[in-house]
Amino acid sequence: MPHSYPALSAEQKKELSDIALRIVAPGKGILAADESVGSMAKRLSQIGVENTEENRRLYRQVLFSADDRVKKCIGGVIFFHETLYQKDDNGVPFIRTILDKGIVVGIKVDKGVVPLAGTDGETTTQGLDGLSERCAQYKKDGADFAKWRCVLKISERTPSALAILENANVLARYASICQQNGIVPIVEPEILPDGDHDLKRCQYVTEKVLAAVYKALSDHHVYLEGTLLKPNMVTPGHACPIKYTPEEIAMATVTALRRTVPPAVPGVTFLSGGQSEEEASFNLNAINRCPLPRPWALTFSYGRALQASALNAWRGQRDNAEAATEEFIKRAEVNGLAAQGKYEGSGEDGGAAAQSLYIANHAY
């Protein structure tokens, strides 16, 4: 086997590892506020608000104006390109607001999913062209981590070996390019919850996908201590008739991770995948109470599951902004507890927190 030339210096490795550990410090997770313009259209239309740049700015301001209470439960915020260069009402750049709280800034760098020819409707993710230059610029502008999402779906014939291999390689290329530019890559191979498959089938597919991802990361000489993983929890398909407990979901999820994710990885930041706010918190809590040894931090990287109640409270009205921000802080604190296995539940069976946030065939 030929010698592998060191891709990163000791200093570069230390910087990447330190950033990753800051993001997933105990009780901390990630706010995913990186919805594209198209995704924001869906969010805003739900509350009857027009999808303009100004309305998107006002909504992001609701989230980013949260006070210092979020410092103990939010370790990182993922921005969308547009948001990275927007300012609050006082002319302070959003990125400065987040950095001043001691929270790490991240950026979504993929350019969306595209069809993978020769498959049954499967996809790969585009955005590698010019990625190195974009990462260098984002690093200068204050971002220290990035996110790239690949999507796989479960059916009788999918995910195919081709889709698994292609997406694993794309994630590895992205991760390698990020690290060369001092940016911690969050690797996101999302297996969609669409379908009627049971828990066992999701666990099997999750194991196969994660095994392929870590093989690719190894092939591309990616420094695992300077990465984070953003996977789906192992859950049944949305149309599955069987209902599973949070404990069953936790056991299946932790088992799949233990079989595939090296202990060198500092943290696993779960996506919420259309679960309701409460469901996402209960499941994360159960995962952190799972009786199996867990060498990584197991925390959250939630979008809708941190924002749904805030969005509902805001409804595009300036007068509601403060109340909406409070709703966001409440969810952030709950998930900070769940990330430590300390969440006892709010007793809220109704309201926005219990609403399913599922969107079929979810594309950002």
Swiss-Prot record:
Entry EC no(s): 4.1.2.13
Modified residues (N6-acetyllysine): K111
Active site: E188, K230
UniProt pathway annotation: Carbohydrate degradation; glycolysis; D-glyceraldehyde 3-phosphate and glycerone phosphate from D-glucose: step 4/4
GO molecular function terms noted in the UniProt entry: fructose-bisphosphate aldolase activity
Site (Necessary for preference for fructose 1,6-bisphosphate over fructose 1-phosphate): Y364
Gene Ontology cellular component terms for the protein in this record: cytosol
Residue sites binding substrate per the record: R56, K147
Positions where Phosphotyrosine occurs in the chain: Y5
Coiled coil: none
Reaction(s) this enzyme catalyzes, per UniProt: beta-D-fructose 1,6-bisphosphate = D-glyceraldehyde 3-phosphate + dihydroxyacetone phosphate
CDD domains hit by this protein: FBP_aldolase_I_a
Residues modified as Phosphoserine: S36, S39, S45, S132
Record keywords: Acetylation, Glycolysis, Lyase, Phosphoprotein, Schiff base
InterPro entries cross-referenced by the UniProt entry: Aldolase_I_AS, Aldolase_TIM, FBA_I
Root EC class: lyase
Keyword DNA-binding belongs to the record: no
GO biological process: fructose 1,6-bisphosphate metabolic process; glycolytic process
Note: In vertebrates, three forms of this ubiquitous glycolytic enzyme are found, aldolase A in muscle, aldolase B in liver and aldolase C in brain.
Family recorded in the similarity comment: Belongs to the class I fructose-bisphosphate aldolase family.
Protein name, per record: Fructose-bisphosphate aldolase C
Gene that encodes the chain: ALDOC
